[in-house]
Regions:
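A conserved hydrophobic helix/loop-capping motif in glycosyltransferases and polysaccharide synthases
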Residues: 2-14, 18, 25, 34, ...
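Short, acidic, metal-binding catalytic loop of nucleotide-sugar glycosyltransferases
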Residues: 20-29, 276-283
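A conserved acidic beta->alpha catalytic loop
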Residues: 34-44, 58, 288-294
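Glycine-rich, basic loop-to-helix element that forms the pyrophosphate-binding segment
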Residues: 56-73
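Short aromatic/hydrophobic "clamp" motif used to bind/position activated sugar donors
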Residues: 78, 328
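Donor nucleotide-sugar recognition loop
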Residues: 86, 153-159, 168-206
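Conserved donor NDP-sugar-binding/catalytic core segment of glycosyltransferases
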Residues: 86-129
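A recurrent flexible, glycine/aromatic-enriched loop bordering the glycosyltransferase active site
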Residues: 141-165
């Protein structure tokens, strides 16, 4: 009836716990365990289990492995789980009762006090690591909650389930964000724009230790160096794709800003400012007749993105920004301040609320609007 996809990287003890919880509460479920190039005994242990198995010889990240697992799934309904989660009683039943085509249903997380509180989750300490879990107390707590819970709210976070064909209809996760993170915020927005309903079941529960699968592999509460590197890269690619940063309401339901075609025209630009601003626009025009600044930027940044930076970073001398773009933002780098940067970060919201065709000035910017065409719907289907 349902297939669970569980990737893991060097998280064998956590993986054993989540697998045991599935076997206990959902023994009929199909389980797909995927080893992300682990260097511990993860793959050896996976091979001993009665499940669908897959191994990547190198670390590719859960952005890729979720999709591989869903490809391997033989059931119509698929769901993901993190290796550092355990499922509670009645987990599948309390998700599936809300499921229909073009719907994504997520569970409610119960987490130890490691992160700020939120209305989309419950903070309760049932153990801080794989070897201190109080599973009986967690299950008793879930059984108590299920006597009174039952409603839904509108929000989205892992773990979730949906129909396999609905997942594949929009092309799955975008490998632009491999290995991780931000692939989740990207696909949540694409689901909404594709017309899917996002529901959170308030009586389907997991206990989630948080961040052990990809962020805190070495020490709880401290980001791994690898995570810092790939997180920065993914964040810059998210901005290139969407033109604005992630925004959610208090229940973690995505708030989607318009995606406009925006170009910056910068006088006296330097390499640091080019690096800071290039992801926030579609095209950036600089004074660089000899191409020295462009070449230096390509050398350091092109390896971090599948976007062709030679099509994004252009010279003022050989191009006509106003003829090539819907919205053109002109300014002098010497006048650019932190306040200016704050405006850049909010520009899509400013344009949505008060933009109109014509010219206007704000802070150090001269803004020319030729069109307010929105392009976010072009991002729904991932064809990579």
């Amino acid at each position: 009836m349902i297939s669970f996809i569980v990737p893991s990287y060097n998280n064998l003890q956590h993986l054993k716990n989540v697998y045991a919880s599935i076997q206990k509460h959902e023994p009929q479920a199909e389980v797909i365990l995927l080893d992300d190039g682990s260097t511990d005994d993860t793959w050896k242990w996976i091979q001993e289990q009665d499940c669908i198995k897959y191994r990547s010889e190198t670390r590719v990240g859960h952005t890729i492995l979720y999709d591989k697992g869903i490809e391997l799934a033989t059931n119509d309904i698929v769901g993901i789980l993190h290796a550092d989660m355990i499922v509670g009683p009645n987990y599948v039943a309390n998700l599936v009762k809300h499921l229909k085509p073009k719907t994504v249903v997520c569970a409610t997380r119960i987490e130890p006090p490691l992160h700020p509180e939120g209305k989309e989750k419950i903070i309760r300490d049932f153990g801080m690591d794989f070897d201190t879990l109080d599973i009986k107390s967690f299950e008793d707590f879930v059984n108590e909650l299920q006597l009174v819970e039952g409603q839904t709210t509108r929000g989205m976070f892992a773990p979730w389930i949906l129909y396999k064909e609905d997942f594949q209809a929009i092309g799955g996760h975008d490998p632009l964000f491999a290995p991780f993170p931000y692939e989740d915020s990207d696909i949540f927005q694409r689901w909404i724009m594709a017309g899917y309903e996002l529901i959170q079941s308030r009586d389907a529960f997991v206990y989630h230790l948080t961040c052990r699968g990809h962020r805190w592999n070495e020490q709880v509460g401290r980001d791994d160096d690898y995570y810092k590197t790939v997180s920065q890269r993914a964040a810059r690619n998210y901005l290139r794709k969407w033109g604005s940063w992630i925004k959610n309401d208090e229940l973690q339901y995505p708030i989607i800003n318009p995606k406009y075609n925006i170009a910056y025209v910068i006088k006296a630009c330097n390499l640091d400012l080019l690096s800071a601003l290039e992801p926030w626009c579609d095209m950036i025009y600089i004074e660089d007749e000899m191409g020295v600044l462009q070449a230096a930027y390509y050398e350091t940044e092109q390896r971090n993105t599948s976007y062709d930076l030679k099509k994004r970073v252009l010279t003022i001398e050989y191009n006509d920004p106003k003829a090539e773009n819907d919205i053109v933002v002109e300014f002098d780098a010497k006048q650019f301040t932190q306040q200016s940067y704050n405006i850049i970060q909010q520009l899509s919201e400013i344009l949505k609320e008060s933009g109109e065709v014509g010219e206007f000035e704000v802070d150090v910017f001269k803004i020319t609007i030729n069109s307010l065409t929105e392009y976010q719907n072009d991002l729904i289907v991932c064809n990579n």
